[in-house]
């Protein structure tokens, strides 16, 4: 019989146990390396490729978004420039319309003033002609009363009327 192990020998296995355990460990390691590792590597490579693909897609999406943003900003800038141009054109057109309306109003006012002036002048001439006729008749009647007889000679009447009108015009 064998002697019973004591102390630390209880925890140290026999040499044959260590050898057989190493042989089994090597066989399991080779089997694992040959059969399971390629499948694990394939799965891990596939996942890595998917992740890389997703990263590339995300990068492409970011680039597309940046391009779309740049395009949008360019269009927005162009729209702002166009809006400013339209606004400036509208202001210029409004100024032009106002200037045209003002010049037409001034022209119309000048025409109305000239027409009124002509009308006043015409009425003045009519008043003078009417006044000459009335003054002539009054002067003839007055002269006839002063002289006591009716003036019958047209030339004398005419010269007398003209001299009285000239006197009235000079007093004015």
Swiss-Prot record:
Stored SUPFAM superfamilies: F1F0 ATP synthase subunit B, membrane domain
Function: F(1)F(0) ATP synthase produces ATP from ADP in the presence of a proton or sodium gradient. F-type ATPases consist of two structural domains, F(1) containing the extramembraneous catalytic core and F(0) containing the membrane proton channel, linked together by a central stalk and a peripheral stalk. During catalysis, ATP synthesis in the catalytic domain of F(1) is coupled via a rotary mechanism of the central stalk subunits to proton translocation. Component of the F(0) channel, it forms part of the peripheral stalk, linking F(1) to F(0).
Species the sequence originates in: Bifidobacterium longum (strain DJO10A)
Domain of life the protein comes from: Bacteria
Protein name: ATP synthase subunit b
Single GO cellular component term: plasma membrane
Alphabetic keyword roster: ATP synthesis, Cell membrane, CF(0), Hydrogen ion transport, Ion transport, Membrane, Transmembrane, Transmembrane helix, Transport
Listed InterPro entries: ATP_synth_B-like_membr_sf (IPR028987), ATP_synth_b/b'su_bac/chlpt (IPR002146), ATP_synth_F0_bsu_bac (IPR005864), ATP_synthase_B_chain (IPR050059)
Residue spans crossing the bilayer: 18-38
């Amino acid at each position: 019989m064998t002697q019973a192990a004591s102390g630390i020998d209880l925890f140290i296995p026999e040499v044959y146990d260590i050898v057989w355990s190493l042989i089994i460990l090597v066989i399991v390691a080779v089997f694992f390396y040959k059969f399971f590792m390629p499948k694990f590597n394939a799965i891990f490579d596939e996942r890595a490729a998917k992740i890389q693909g997703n990263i590339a897609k995300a990068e492409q999406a970011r680039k597309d978004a940046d391009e779309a943003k740049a395009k949008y900003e360019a269009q927005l800038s162009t729209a702002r420039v166009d809006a400013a141009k339209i606004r400036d054109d509208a202001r210029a057109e409004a100024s032009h319309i106002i200037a045209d309306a003002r010049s037409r109003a001034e022209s119309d006012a000048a025409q109305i003033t000239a027409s009124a002036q002509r009308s006043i002048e015409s009425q003045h001439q009519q008043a003078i002609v009417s006044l000459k006729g009335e003054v002539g008749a009054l002067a003839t009647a007055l002269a006839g009363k002063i002289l006591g007889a009716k003036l019958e000679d047209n030339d004398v009447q005419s010269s007398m009327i003209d001299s009285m009108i000239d006197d009235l015009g000079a007093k004015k």
